[in-house]
Amino acid sequence: MPIRILPSDLSSQISAGEIIERPASVVKEIIENSIDAGSKNINIIVENSGFQSIILKDDGCGIDKKDLLLAVCHHATSKINSLSDLDKLTTFGFRGEALASIRAVSRLTLISCTRFNDVAAKIYLEGFCSKNIILQPIAHPEGTTIIVDNLFYNIPVRLKFLKNKKLEFSKICEVVKKIALSHFYINFSLKHNNKLITQYNSINNRKNKINRLKDIFDTLDTSEFLEIKEKKYRMVLFGWISHPYNFKKIKNIQYCYVNNRYLYNNIFVNAVRAAYSKIEQKKNISFVLYLTIESFNIDINIHPTKNEIKFHNPDVVYTFIYEAVFSYLKKIKEKYYFNFSCKKQTQLNKEKEFYFYDSDPTFLTLISSIFFKKKQIFKNIKNKIKHNNFISKSTPLEKYESSIGRLLIIIHKYYGLIYHDNNFLLLSFPVAKGIVRKQKLKNNIQKENIIEYFLSNIKINLTSQEYLILFNKKEILSKFGFHLIFKKKYVILSSIPAFLKKCNFHIIISNFFAFLFLKKQVFISDIVDWFYINVFIELKNWTYIRGIEVLLEIEYYCPLLLINPPSKLLQKININAALCILKI
């Protein structure tokens, strides 16, 4: 058979099949057009699951009567003018294919009016045959009405594969639901066979956005969801995630949006699941998340229906979503277990009987406060309490005494007042935590157990001398988790130690490399000391619970340090001198 160009009506039907798969595809395309037109009210009326007719009415800006015929032609759009505009897209449509594809497989009526038109215009088309075009004036308010009749009337083969009308209508409902979830300021209504199915009222207050979830998911208990909002890496993440310690059975809801466009993306799902796995192993994870990202950092034009998207820096997006979700889950974890401990303590204090060590409120409270910490610390605590088989239930948390002594109070955010053997001591928590982290790093290097954090490759330009210094030190750097790829004139950094990921690692790495360039010879101890001074000592507010946690870590990781503690860690307070002055 010779090669020939297909007739225009046949080629249009074939290309339309990629975009218009079912009635729900029509609903999606025309709603997105209405949103691009700035509509505040969108009403959808469906007959016979969309096979008989689909009607959409909106109050958008409308289509000028001189552009009405052009609007139903292939590749006719007002969204882009040049190839560079694809990097600046803020609209749903841009290819100019939606109405042309719908026209190719249905009997289409398009009525529209702009604020500049005295009268509206109506156009009627059957398939892609230019002979059946009727254009006439008509009365109509500002906005657009689209009537799609007899869908797939000219493609009977397609109708054979779409026999389940209940399924097709459920697909339409799902499309409306997905779009309504990302456009809170628009009123949506859906009617089927003259019966109102859904009505989603507009929400103008950000605090009330969760009410849209209540409207869409009738049985959903929104109190089981946490609102999150994070801004970083020139991206914004907003939405709701299910409570990590929710023990009720809730519907599995997973919706993710990029620039208000719904899509199912593995980066979202994997990042959220990874964050939950650090807190609580849950099979049933629900979330509705909205990512706002600069349009030039994504590629929408990779799928006919635009249901897929490509990120130019997927690793950065994954890291951002993971860190944002994990930070909120971590706060909830700490709050949840602290409340659990307080309730348990109150309940136990009502009783004055004695019991075995494993019901000790000290043990329970400590376990809850350092939940999910190293198993070795748990064993250490348990061994300590095991020496006293019977302990009073009224033993409060503040009576817990470590080898250093009993922590009484936090002073000036960073220091702990400790009582030990009739002496008062002042402990620096930043120094203590730094020493613990330093010892952990030493242990991990000895065991070759450094955890790496993989980056999107970072290119580092170096002088020939700096290049040579790093090349000579690549083996010792690899022990710390720095993976360097040496090219001819530059170096690529692909991983760093995991303990740097929460820091501003770009500045830390720059300073660290500057330190290496000044050293002709460097040892493991030199690098450990550098991290101790520049990374491990953090000035942040300390709580009583975290203070006890650090005391336990010192006991476990640095027991020899307690024999002769450094002056920067622990200072004895001269109470006797003060008593002599105050003596009556």
Curated annotation (Swiss-Prot):
Residue stretches in coiled coil: none
Top-rank lineage group of the source organism: Bacteria
User: Would the keyword DNA repair turn up in this protein's UniProt record?
Assistant: yes
Q: What Gene Ontology cellular component terms go with this record?
A: mismatch repair complex
Is Metal-binding included in the keywords of this UniProt record?
A: no
Q: Which UniProt keywords apply?
A: DNA damage, DNA repair
Instruction: Tell me which PROSITE patterns the record gives.
Output: DNA_MISMATCH_REPAIR_1
List the molecular function annotations (GO) for this entry.
ATP binding; ATP hydrolysis activity; ATP-dependent DNA damage sensor activity; mismatched DNA binding
SMART domains cross-referenced by the UniProt entry: DNA_mis_repair
InterPro entries membership: DNA_mismatch_repair_CS (IPR014762), DNA_mismatch_repair_MutL (IPR020667), DNA_mismatch_S5_2-like (IPR013507), HATPase_C_sf (IPR036890), MutL/Mlh/PMS (IPR002099), MutL/Mlh/Pms-like (IPR038973), MutL_C (IPR014790), MutL_C_dimsub (IPR042120)
Which biological process, per GO, is one annotated for this protein?
Answer: mismatch repair
The record's Pfam families line, in alphabetical order, gives: DNA_mis_repair, HATPase_c_3, MutL_C
Q: Which HAMAP family match?
A: DNA_mis_repair (MF_00149)
Family assignment?
Belongs to the DNA mismatch repair MutL/HexB family.
- NCBIfam families according to UniProt: mutl (TIGR00585)
Its protein name is DNA mismatch repair protein MutL
Q: Which species does the entry assign this protein to?
A: Buchnera aphidicola subsp. Acyrthosiphon pisum (strain 5A)
